[in-house]
Amino acid sequence: NMITAEPIAQAEQAAKTAALNGVLPAFDETAAETLTIDEMPITVYTATKGGQLAGYAVESMTKNGFGGAINMMVGFTPDGEVINVNVLKQAETPGLGTKMADADNVLLRSVKGQKLEEKKLVNGKLAVAKDGGDVDALTAATISSRAYVDAINRAWMAYKSVAMGATPTDVSSGATSAAGDSAEEQTSGPEAQEGGQNE
């Protein structure tokens, strides 16, 4: 088993490096910090080049995908603009939710090159148009689209926590209400989308 463990670890490291390269400008070093947000591990990579801050890459996830968990890498400039989003793992419906991994898909176009705080937020978070936000959803894949946005929101919280020292609870509750409210919001999400139709 040791024979296969080494190449698998190398392959995973290579995939991680490729994912970082896909969402960050040129860098020569990264420092990783893992936070727990909504009981999920979210890792923030602070990238530097020649000792200067180059950007942040956040390995984020959601458990609300139509086909289960979705993992992604989200890159931010030092001042919070989304550089790129790289979907690392998803099991969404082929031809519908899987489009979230396509280059230049509508979800990506809704966030790439933008500062998320300047978007139309709902309770301080990104949301798809159907939920009052301004992120365009994938056609016939609203649940997948909501899950994508959920993972981006978590990445944004982690970025703000590391880059600006905001605590994830402050960020998730919009800093005005008690942290209990955000926990309540979380639980109502997945139940509302049961029923088999990714619509």
Name these PLM-found stretches.
Residues 1-199:
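Flexible, solvent-exposed loop/hinge segments and secondary-structure transition points
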